[in-house]
Amino acid sequence: MPLYTTKKSNKLRASMFDEKPAKDYDPEAEPRDGDDDQSGSEADSDVERAETEHYVTVGKSKLRKAEAPTLGPEYSGTRVSRKALEESDEEDFEDEEEDDEEDDDDEDDLEDGESETGSEEFADPDTADLERDHIDEDAEISSDNALGEDDADWAEKFTFRGSSKPKTPAKTSKKDDLAVRIKKRPTAADFMSGSEDDEEEEDDEEDLEEDEEDEEDSEEGEQNGLFDMEAEETEDDEGEDDEEELDGALLSGSDDEEGDSEEDDEDDEEGSGDEDEDEDDEDEDEDEDDESGDDDEKNDVNAELRKIMAEDEKKIVSTFSKAAEADAQKGVAVRSQRRIFDSILNLRIRLQKALIAANTFNCVEKPENFKEKPYEAAEEAAVKLWNTIDSVRNSFLPEQVKAKAGEKRKRDAIELDTPAQEIWEVLEAVEGPANKYRRQVLDKWSTRVRSTTASMTKERRLAQSAGSQSLVSVLDDQLLSADRLIKKARTPRSCAPAQAAKKVEEDADIYDDADFYQLLLKELVDQRSSDSAAPGESVATVRWAALKEAKTRKQVDRKASKGRKLRFTVHEKLQNFMAPEDRRSWEEHAIDRFFGTLFGQKMVLKEDEAEAEAAEEDEEMGGVNVEEAGLKLFRS
């Protein structure tokens, strides 16, 4: 790119970057007239000025150019002229040009020097900074400067690869232990004599001195900037020869201790070499065996763990299955108990009519034509019922109770001619042992279900102190006042309606357990109508259920208001309906005329049509009035 060296070129370059504002075109602006029309324009301007004197000057339209936001005084800066800007730009360009010219002169001088000498000039080795020149190259670093102060901690534990005796051998697995044992194996150097050790130390000292001399020579070569590659190769060869000599001395050191000949030494060396190879092979085999043994042990452990887990799962499943079976058996037992209770309650409800009939026997008078046959049939049915109840009752008793009650001999059924005293003795013989068994069963189950009866209502509690006493003791306390209970059972209520209608206070020939019967019915209704009542709360009764139902909101379609839905009632379909058929011989007009002239009176039906027809008939009859000439019934 060419350089602009003159002021004119700088201004031209600066003008290239100037942004010129775009000029808006105003269609309302009038074109500018020439100089020839100046005289005429003055006259026209006077006229226009007179016509536009009442105009008010307004600002420019904001639609064309928006006004700039007004800033405060803190945003105001110093005004700079364009001349000052151009002068500052010219000074900057002049400085850049001077720098470029100096660089060009330096390059030209370098090219001229190379062309004259024909080779590159090197800096003075005494004054040159070699470290700066070789800062990017891979120069050798002395061992003293290789590590810093911060690297001392981890460098203490660091060991080079191939070292025979590490400071802290890691013992993480069997493989690592085996490697440590291999490294600790004695070598030929361990069996060398003291003289050989001294010779080795002297050789090592000589080698160290030679190495130091080599390092000094290399440092001098680096300072001069010349590296003799051949000298380095010879030094490397000498170092390798020294190492080979040391290895040979180490391997051939065992012959001086034993005092054997050179042949024995050769045999020993061959034997030791073979032994080392054999030991290496054995070590590899041992490593493989150890690895295979470790894999087998892991597989065995995993198999044992799987077996134990499977056994534990089986035990857990068996325990859960047993618990589930026990719960299922309990549920089945509870359902069977509830079913038995419901069946007994159903039997009691059905016996209510029979009890009412039995209580009304004494109030019914015997008719004159009373026959014995129906009475005998009822007696036979009662005896049969008693035998059935007795057999069912005996079936619930265990064998021990039956033996005590004298059930070893075969029981005979009661017949019609069996006296009442014998029937009573049979009942007492069975009631004694059965009472003891019944009390044991009540005690057993009352203790088991005592915790579940905490939510029992007051009506169902037999006593307020039932929580501290057993069920049998509570029943005994209730039966102590037997006279009160007997009197209450002989008072006529719902089970003796005939005596209750006659307002009899007490009757010895009846049995009325209306209180207990009402309690059973109430429990049944509560069981059917109760929802899921919370523990500790009373069970909902029928009355409460009715009140709850009354409080619930009715299901009403609230979107059907304001005519948004059509309200209609679907009528039932008409069945066996036949529409009447018109089988009359008279026409409707004749029927209307007949009823209109009935009893000598003319009834006006459809006045307009009647007048029009009357006028037509008058015209047809030649102006004679039809009504006057017509026949009228019952005319006087």
Curated annotation (Swiss-Prot):
Compositionally biased tracts (Acidic residues): 33-45, 87-128, 136-153, 195-222, 229-247, 254-298
Keywords on record: Nucleus
Disordered: annotated span: 1-303
Pfam families linked: AATF-Che1, TRAUB
Lineage: superkingdom: Eukaryota
GO cellular component: nucleolus
This protein's record includes keyword Acetylation: no
Subcellular location: Nucleus, Nucleolus
Gene Ontology process terms (BP): maturation of SSU-rRNA from tricistronic rRNA transcript (SSU-rRNA, 5.8S rRNA, LSU-rRNA)
Protein name in UniProt: Protein bfr2
Origin species: Neurospora crassa (strain ATCC 24698 / 74-OR23-1A / CBS 708.71 / DSM 1257 / FGSC 987)
